[in-house]
Regions:
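Glycine-rich phosphate-binding loop of ATP-dependent small-molecule kinases
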Residues: 1-216
């Protein structure tokens, strides 16, 4: 049976890092909704072009367009044993749509780790975050520094700091996330799949909590 995980947590909590740990442990891909958007837009797919028209107008991309792209990604051979979904769903309605989609693949959402940390820690983490230009790998000047300053350990590309990682924008992103995600947390709690993970710990200890949750 495939295993499907939805990873939740506010900006800066370390979802991307932990998703990679889980992906390696389970031998399934880490699928970020942001990466799916970028891939479809870059490749000029029908859904990518449609999404771009909404984005150009400053409008939200409709759920059916996003789900179509996610469905296509989940249908690829590397997802035969499952996948880790990050960045989507964000609302109960989207979660229901994901549930319906996964049923068509013979699976369901097996686990929803919700990684949390105090706001001041999230602010500190984001302010020191650097991102790989080529593949989006994330490093931190204090918590997870690259071996060579300014260079990605994985592909040797340049690391850069995103514009939205400044303090004011970060605080707004955290507040928006909490407001948007609260109903989603309740949705997964009711289904018994939500597991709260303490993200205010070293990376390996957070990973250990996730692995332990998988075994239950």
């Amino acid at each position: 049976m495939p295993i499907y995980i939805v990873l939740l947590g506010p900006p800066g909590v370390g979802k991307g890092t932990q998703a990679e740990v889980l992906a390696e442990k389970l031998q399934v891909p880490h699928i970020s909704s942001g990466d799916i958007f970028r891939e479809n837009i870059k490749n000029g797919t029908e859904m990518g072009k449609l999404a771009q028209t909404y984005m150009n107008k400053g409008e939200l991309v409709p759920d059916d367009v996003t789900l179509s792209m996610i469905r296509e990604r989940f249908s690829r051979p590397d997802c035969i044993n499952g996948a880790i979904l990050d960045g989507f769903p964000r609302t109960p309605a989207q979660a229901e749509a994901v549930d319906t989609m996964l049923k068509s693949f013979g699976g369901c959402v097996d686990l929803v780790p919700y990684i949390t940390a105090p706001v001041d820690i999230l602010m500190e983490r984001l302010a020191g975050r650097w991102t790989c230009r080529k593949a989006g790998h994330i490093f931190h000047e204090r918590f997870n520094p690259p071996r060579r300053q300014g260079i990605c350990d994985f592909d040797g590309s340049e690391l850069y700091q995103r514009d939205d990682d400044n303090p004011q924008t970060v605080m707004h992103r955290i507040e928006v996330y909490k407001d948007q995600t609260s109903p989603l947390i309740d949705y997964y709690k009711e289904r018994g799949t939500l597991v709260e993970i303490n993200g205010f710990m070293p990376i390996d200890q957070v990973s250990a909590q996730l692995i332990s949750a998988l075994k239950k």
